[in-house]
Amino acid sequence: LAFCYLKLKMYDEAYAAFSKAIVNNFDNSEVYFYAAVCLLKGAKAFLHNRQEIDKMLELINAAIMIEPRGVYYYFMAYIKYDYFKRKFLNTTPNYKDCLLQAHMYGCPKGDIDHFYEVAGVPHVDIV
């Protein structure tokens, strides 16, 4: 159901469904990843407030702790670039560190394209 809401760009409903799934599947990294994607609400990270960004990063970090995957690090790199770098805010790790991790864990172009497709945000060249 959560994926249907996400495909229909019903981000609040999708987030609620993924949040409920986290309770029942707390060891499934993808649930945390997609919950974080929902918080973007189809808008660039740059346009969100810091509290929303922090929640996204919390969910991505949870996904990484369960199963480190390249696309999770890429999502983190996207946030670190589009929010922190564009607002001239220093953060550790920075987007370059996250990109390095994404490549270390393997992040094929198909995963990156899928991220941008489900997130509903324009593709950003952060390399």
Q: Where do the language-model regions lie?
A:
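Alpha-helical segment of the N-proximal tetratricopeptide repeat
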Residues: L1-M10
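Short coil/turn linking the two alpha-helices of tandem helical-hairpin repeats
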Residues: K9, A36, L40-R50, A77, ...
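Short coil turns that delineate tetratricopeptide repeat
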Residues: F26, I66-P68, M104-C107
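Start-of-helix register in tetratricopeptide repeats
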Residues: E30, V71-Y72, D111
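Canonical tetratricopeptide repeat
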Residues: Y34-A35, F75, F115
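Terminal, low-structured helical/coil segments at or just beyond the last alpha-helical repeat
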Residues: R86, N90-V127
